[in-house]
Amino acid sequence: MKIAVLLSGGVDSSVALYTMIQKGYKNIKCYYLKIWLEDELSYIGECPWEEDINYVEAVCTKFNVPYEIISLQDEYYKRVVTYAIEELKIGNTPSPDIFCNQRIKFGAFFDKINEHYDLIVTGHYAKIENKNNHYILKQAKDKIKDQSYFLSHLSREQISKLHFPLGDLLKTEIRQIAHKIDLPNKNRKDSQGICFLGKIKYDEFIKYHLGELKGNIIEQETGKILGTHNGYWFFTIGQRKGIKLSHGPWFVTEKDIQNNIIYISNSVNYLAQGKHQFLVHKTNWINKPVNNIDLSAKIRHGEKKIKCKIEMLKNDIIKVDLEEKDYGISPGQFCIFYQEDECLGGAQILQTLT
C-alpha cells in the first residue's frame, strides 16, 4: 500500500507519521504544502514555512522517509484567499479553514498526487469509519482538539482516501509519544488561531487586502455614536474583542455595510438578543440525517454542540431551530450538523430569524 503523509512541521503530523511506521507501513512519502505568496508575506508577516521545513526535514531524516515540498500557492490564492476576501467585502464572516481542507489539502493536493497513493494520512483530530464501503466522519476522542468542524465540507470520495491516526488519542498522549521517541519538534508549541493564516495576524491579512475606512460605532438601543472603527470588515456579529470603548463589555450586534456602521450593545442588552432560528444554504452532506432525533449543531469551532431540529425548505434552504439561543450567529459562517459523534456535513449561514 502506497501512503502519502502531509507534514506541517508540527508535533501532531509527525506523530501521525510515526504511528503509520509503527503499524508496519513502509511505502511512505511525506509532503509539505507551500501556500502563501511571497509578496503578501513581505507585507503582512514573517515567512511561515522556513522553520516548518526545517522540522519536516529533521523528522523525515529521523525516520528515513523521503519528503517533497509542493507549491500550491496559486491554487490557494484562487480557491481560499479570494473566497475570504469576497465574503469580507459583503459583510460576511468567512470560514477559510473549511475551504483550505476541502479545496487545498484534500482538493488541489489530491489532484496532483491522488492517483498515485492508496491512502492520505494527516495529523487531524478526527476519525473515519468504513462500514461496508460507507464512510463516516466522526469526532475525535479529544473533544477540545476535535477538527471535524473544519472537515465537514469534504466529499465522501475525499474521505474514502483519508486516514487520521490521532483520532483515538488525546493531545497529552501525543505529546508523551513525541517525547518518548525524541522527535526533533517534541517541544514545539501548537499553532494558535486560524489555521489558514499560520503565523500571519488576521487583522493584518484583512488590512492588506481591503485597507481601512473610518466609520462610526453606534449603540444599538440609543443611536448614540460612541466611537469610530477602521472598517466593517474587521468585525463579526458577537465579537467582543477589539471594541476599545469604556463602560463595557460591548458586543457587535449588527453591521450596516452600505454606511460602514458597526452597531454594538452592552452585555445586558446583548444577552437579550440571542437567536435560536436561522437559515442556511449551500449544504454539503457527507451523510444525510435519517431523522431529527439526536441532531445537534456547531455554530463555530469548539467543544459546544447545541441540540437542534432542521426543516428542509425550497431552493435547498434549511431552517435550523436550536434548542437554546446562541449569541453570535453571523451570516457567512458555517453551521455543522452532528448525530451523536458523527459529523453529517454543514451549510453556510444565510440569515438569522428569531
From Swiss-Prot:
This is tRNA-specific 2-thiouridylase MnmA. The active site is at C100 (nucleophile), C195 (cysteine persulfide intermediate). It catalyses: S-sulfanyl-L-cysteinyl-[protein] + uridine(34) in tRNA + AH2 + ATP = 2-thiouridine(34) in tRNA + L-cysteinyl-[protein] + A + AMP + diphosphate + H(+). The record marks H124, Q333 as: Interaction with tRNA. It comes from Borrelia hermsii (strain HS1 / DAH). It holds the Pfam family tRNA_Me_trans_M. InterPro entries: MnmA-like, MnmA-like_C, MnmA-like_central, MnmA-like_central_sf, Rossmann-like_a/b/a_fold, tRNA_2-thiouridylase_MnmA. Disulfide bonds join C100-C195. ATP binds at L6, L7, S8, G9, G10, V11, D12, S13, L33, G123. It is found in: Cytoplasm. Keywords: ATP-binding, Cytoplasm, Disulfide bond, Nucleotide-binding, RNA-binding, Transferase, tRNA processing, tRNA-binding. CDD domains: MnmA_TRMU-like (cd01998). It comes from the Bacteria. Residues 145-147 are annotated as: Interaction with tRNA. The keyword Transmembrane does not apply. Belongs to the MnmA/TRMU family. Catalyzes the 2-thiolation of uridine at the wobble position (U34) of tRNA, leading to the formation of s(2)U34. One of its GO terms (biological process) is tRNA modification. One of its GO terms (molecular function) is tRNA binding. Its EC number is 2.8.1.13.
